[in-house]
């Protein structure tokens, strides 16, 4: 099948793949055609970020699909990076991870605390990767406009 990959800015390209190909393979093909290192690529399908280790079929990507490509600045972490190093180096979250480390150290042995923290970071990063653009838009709207709280209608079922 042929996929179209469209950078936010720049010329799109087509890549020939099977539905069983991994996202990382698509990134390598795009790298060859657009001269953008795979480590700087973030592929999106219908607003959802694609994880390198998943297959195209995991996202129900079929023939003639269009993928959006976001190019990260050089040096920014890739989605396949190890969780602890990227999360600890992240300026916005380093305080949170340091605080978590302190709390875990009070309740676990150093080895167990490290394992628990590593798993929490992996789960956190996986959750972030699964956010769609719609999810992010809703979250931003709630944060920017808290006075317009949405009424909980779950009790109406």
From Swiss-Prot:
GO terms for biological process: post-translational protein targeting to endoplasmic reticulum membrane; tail-anchored membrane protein insertion into ER membrane. It comes from the Eukaryota. Gene3D superfamilies: Phosphatidylinositol 3-kinase Catalytic Subunit, Chain A, domain 1. Residues 1-76 form the Ubiquitin-like domain. Keywords: Cytoplasm, Nucleus, Transport. InterPro entries: Ubiquitin-like_dom, Ubiquitin-like_domsf, Ubiquitin_CS, Ubiquitin_dom, Ubl4_C_TUGS, UBL4A-like, Ubl_UBL4A-like. SMART domains: UBQ. It is found in: Cytoplasm, Cytosol; Nucleus. Its main location: cytoplasm. GO terms for molecular function: protein-folding chaperone binding. One of its GO terms (cellular component) is BAT3 complex. The keyword Zinc-finger does not apply. PANTHER family: UBIQUITIN-LIKE PROTEIN 4A. Component of the bag6/bat3 complex. As part of a cytosolic protein quality control complex, the bag6/bat3 complex, maintains misfolded and hydrophobic patches-containing proteins in a soluble state and participates in their proper delivery to the endoplasmic reticulum or alternatively can promote their sorting to the proteasome where they undergo degradation. The bag6/bat3 complex is involved in the post-translational delivery of tail-anchored/type II transmembrane proteins to the endoplasmic reticulum membrane. This is Ubiquitin-like protein 4A. The lineage of its organism: Eukaryota, Metazoa, Chordata, Craniata, Vertebrata. The gene is ubl4a.
């Amino acid at each position: 099948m042929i996929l179209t990959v469209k950078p936010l800015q720049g010329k799109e390209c087509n890549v020939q793949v099977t539905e069983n190909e991994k996202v990382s393979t698509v990134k390598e093909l795009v790298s060859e055609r657009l001269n953008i290192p795979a480590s700087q690529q973030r592929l999106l399908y219908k607003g959802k970020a694609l994880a390198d280790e998943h297959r195209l079929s995991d996202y129900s990507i079929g023939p003639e699909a269009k993928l959006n490509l976001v190019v990260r600045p050089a040096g920014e972490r890739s989605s396949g990076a190890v969780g602890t190093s990227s999360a600890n180096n992240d300026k916005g979250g380093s305080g949170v991870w340091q605080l978590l480390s302190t709390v875990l150290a009070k309740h676990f042995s150093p080895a167990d605390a490290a394992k628990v923290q590593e798993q929490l970071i992996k789960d956190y990063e996986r959750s972030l990767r699964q956010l769609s653009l719609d999810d992010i838009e809703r979250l931003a709207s709630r944060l920017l406009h808290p006075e317009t709280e949405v009424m909980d209608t779950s009790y109406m079922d």
